[in-house]
Amino acid sequence: MRGAASLAAALTLLAPAVAGASREPAALAIAAWPARVVLTAPGRATIHVENPGVDPVVIDAAPSGYRLDLHGRPRLGAAGALAARVRVHPYRIALAGRSAVELTVTATRAAAARPGDHALVVLLTTRLPTGRALLAHLRIGVVVVLRVPGTVVRRLAVSGLRVERHRRQVLFEVSVANRGNVDEWLARRRLELRLVGHGRVLARLHGEPRRLLARTRGLVEARYAGRIRGPLTVVVTLTGPRPGVKVLRRAFQVRL
């Protein structure tokens, strides 16, 4: 469904049945798309929300803090000053079964905001319809990247390598810092690891794709299931770390 979002599709809080409810508990399923929007401040964007089920649902929409942990997993946080500059209309929806609605996200520019990307999330949280029993509150989110105009800085750096053995495979975790002010997408072939021994390239690995938010650091994972053991040199190659630089290389000494 055109990139329907199920971010943080979770979890939610079990809720008791409403006293006196005469019907079976409602089974909820909501969807939203796109999963990620980039909004230049000041400006506006549209989020589509759908209720594919037969039961009506009430949805509250509100901006919240958002970040990625070191492994790229989404985490919610307290709404910062920029979240106060974001408005969602309507912020409460009574959505009939098998129907959809459009939400408008509007952002104003904060005078003190730094140029570049600032990630938030618009949380869509279900509520109990009046007189109905509900097994759980469902929460999903749409990532909203608020882009403040100004000088764009793109700068990635490889800052470290960690090696861990997991049963029959070896996990390489490359620490990459986004020192720029815009989000970066690290596609699978943008980061390569070469395992070098005795002057020869013994294996080539590619990092798992992930996003790095502006001004953050994260780990890019690559897995090796071969039989190479002993001391090695791992050459990490990152393509396009900054304008004017095609590749960045760092070498690390490890033992498998």
List PLM regions with ranges.
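Beta-strand-rich interaction surfaces with strong enrichment in secreted/lumenal proteins
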Residues: 35, 89-95, 161, 206-212, ...
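Short solvent-exposed strand-capping/beta-turn motif centered on an Asx-Ser/Thr pair
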Residues: 48-55, 66-68, 177-184, 227, ...
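Exposed aromatic-hydrophobic patches
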Residues: 46, 102-104, 219-225
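Terminal connector regions
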Residues: 55, 62-66, 108-151, 227-256
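Surface-exposed binding patches on compact interaction domains or structured appendages
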Residues: 23-34, 52-102, 187-202
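Short, solvent-exposed loop/turn segments enriched in Ser/Thr/Gly
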Residues: 31, 40-46, 99-103, 113-121, ...
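Short proline/glycine- and polar residue-rich coil/turn motifs
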Residues: 39, 93-101, 209-218, 244, ...
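Beta-sheet-dominated interaction scaffolds and their linkers
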Residues: 23-56, 92, 155-167, 173
